[in-house]
Amino acid sequence: MNQVEVALDTIPVHVTVNSEPRLSHRPSGLYPMFLLAVLATVMMLFAAFTAALIVRRTGSDWVPVQIPSVVWLNTVFIVTSSILLECAKKAFSRGSGSQASLWLGYSIALGVLFLIGQLIAWSVLNDQGFLLSTNTHAAFFYMLSGVHGAHVLGGIGVLVWTLRRALAGAYGIDQYRGVAHAAIYWHCVGAVWIHLLVLLSIT
């Protein structure tokens, strides 16, 4: 019995330590494909709205309205929000998760302010008597800003989910692709709004 124990003690044991970085928090290859599909859908949707507005604007019953001034402040909100998302990405690349989470929180707050500002713009137009049924220009503003606002709301949901993962330590120096993908969508939503604002401002 002792000889067996001695023999077992002399068997070499090799332990392999996996030094590869953890990939559990990295999105799979399906995420970029899904993102591209979403962006393509958004672009086609607003391209159709753009064409409809251009055609409708040539009608004899087109009466332009003054875009509420709060809309320009809203534009500053959403542009600044995109800039702060880029700051968050850079903070993650430096390994500063707490700073990145702070930038994400500010970006979300500005997105919420943007939506509140759009509701104020609707209220201003309504108080001036420009309703969906009484003015075509105002109707397009309600429709386009409403559809766009729905996409902004969806983007805020994604950013909130991203922030929760960031606070849970899911992202690091080499593990923040999820943040990058969320930023791409948010930048797209911001660019679409600038396009719509220019389109609606040209009377």
Regions found by a protein language model. Give the residues of each.
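...captures the hydrophobic TM-helix bundle architecture rather than a specific catalytic motif
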Residues: 1-203
